Amino acid sequence: MVNKYTYTSSKAMSDISDVIGEPLAAWDSQVGGRVFNVIFDGKVYTNTYWVERWQVPGIGSSDGNPHNAWKFVRAATADEINKIGNPTTADVKPTENIPSPILVEDKYTEETYSRPDVNFKEDGSQGNLSYTATRVCAPMYNHYVGDKTKPKLSAYITDWCQYDARLDGGGSKEEERGRGFDLATLMQNPATYDRLIFSFLGICGDIGNKSKKVQEVWDGWNAQAPSLGLPQIGKGHIVPLDPYGDLGTARNVGLPPESADTSIESGTFLPYYQQNRAAGLLGGLRELQKKAHAMGHKLDLAFSIGGWSLSSYFSALAENPDERRVFVASVVDFFVRFPMFSCVDIDWEYPGGGGDEGNISSDKDGENYVLLIKELRSALDSRFGYSNRKEISIACSGVKAKLKKSNIDQLVANGLDNIYLMSYDFFGTIWADYIGHHTNLYSPKDPGEQELFDLSAEAAIDYLHNELGIPMEKIHLGYANYGRSAVGGDLTTRQYTKNGPALGTMENGAPEFFDIVKNYMDAEHSLSMGKNGFVLMTDTNADADFLFSEAKGHFISLDTPRTVKQKGEYAAKNKLGGVFSWSGDQDCGLLANAAREGLGYVADSNQETIDMGPLYNPGKEIYLKSISEIKSK
């Protein structure tokens, strides 16, 4: 039995219940996730989300956070008061000093906050980058009863997430401060996800900002190959970007220290580039999959090629028949080396342009993409057959204009299995003209002619399914384990300071979820709410959440447990293939739990770390005007 973080309530909002709503009653400290209708002081109230026994109708909080779930409906009639009652006073208090098992003190993070070159304050009043490590949150992963009929939960896992030199006495330099995510936290519940996607492999020929690293590994491969009886490789071949982190280390990858091999680097890695000899993140994923299978859970593994920083050569590769053959053969080779993988994920950002600066692009990218997928499908089927079939997935933009250049309907017709819709980064500081939601499911009610400023996941899904005819079960809806922030935000005009110091964890404008939970959003005291001067708010125009602090106009668009659960419910209702996150190493389990519950999975009461029910509340309601509405004035 897990020591469960128990709230003051006794029934989870997510629990299955036959009771949809209660008949009108006198207020009497009702508690739970059901819909209650009560009379208090001559008025009728209903709860809009989880309600605690100590929340008194009509009494709000002083800081603007929605601590009180009761919403005024109407005046009670004299007949109702006579028959039901009319309490007018209350003498209840919240449980005080609730234990705080989500947050954990991490001395390295605290020391970093106080460094003169960092000078971070949790209210956003000083330095904007926190360099918060994942260690500030305890693992909060619940166990859920398996159900093969429900949509799947996936997550990308990055091969740089494990690093944090502060664990070894470093941290004086910015590049030494890392996330320090430990894969061992998932070892405690290997059934958290249905698929994990190892990210990223690079492509020989890369010309982007990672080109030197790609070239180093490429040269190292070719230097080792002759002595191992292997052919040398050329442009188009996929390579690991971090041989030591992928194959050699035991730190933060769920492996015992003795399994590490510090000699592994670009010039020595090739003998270890296989499933049975790998340590590093690849070895950790191997062991995680074994643990999942041992407990009866099928954990699929995929490997992703490209991503934002490694997509520079896709266009040239896809256009060249010889390099396509090299690429396809190298993907087959990776599957042979690592048979634990069942899927290859192509993350080309983006066909037709719009990716990182310096990326090659062409008007023919869409048609060449089809050739690449077609040839890859043919080679995989020829080598592995049906019984050991390997899937092909892509990560694609959530922006309709970019989707149109990817020829996705033809990709599906030529063998594409899954589409991971990157329904995040709709907003971001510097590139966005206005503050907005970065990972919202729904568009504003009337986006009008300015819809490019108010994007949404649903609009992208509508294009894929209704315009291109993509089957819903091939689409996986993305949620973000990080926020997008701005400073100097004005909620009326949606203006912000474009080049200002926006709050972030490791980079400007990108606070990660564990950092958000530590510094800006309270998830520990019965409800999701803001803290340290931040207010959790819900835009009723798009049904999306954000955090806002008036002190400096700090704005953080984010997915909360409520919005992630909402995405899971949408996926289940519309029979999508599932939901996924970028990235699993930015979450402590709260958002993964919310996704599971939204998809319809039921928590195992004997292995439930946290009751998620109270965390599904909306924030303080506000109506953010669409850009069309603002411009029409």
From Swiss-Prot:
Record-annotated active site: 349 (proton donor)
Alphabetized GO MF terms: chitin binding; endochitinase activity
Activity control mechanisms: Toxin complex is secreted when grown at 25 degrees Celsius or less; at higher temperatures the proteins are present intracellularly but not secreted.
Subcellular location: Secreted
Secreted listed as a keyword: yes
Sorted UniProt keywords: Carbohydrate metabolism, Chitin degradation, Glycosidase, Hydrolase, Polysaccharide degradation, Secreted, Virulence
EC number: 3.2.1.14
Activity versus pH, per record: Optimum pH is 5.0, in the intact toxin complex optimum pH is pH 4.0 to pH 8.0.
One of the protein's GO biological processes: polysaccharide catabolic process
Disruption outcome: Cells with a disrupted yenA1-yenA2-chi2-yenB-yenC1-yenC2 locus are no longer pathogenic in C.zealandica larvae.
Described purpose of this protein according to its UniProt entry: Part of an orally active toxin complex (TC) with strong insecticidal effects on larvae of the Coleoptera Costelytra zealandica, Acrossidius tasmania and Adoryphorus couloni and some Lepidoptera larvae. The TC has an endochitinase activity. This subunit might aid infection by degradation of the larval peritrophic membrane.
Protein name: Chitinase 2
Species: Yersinia entomophaga
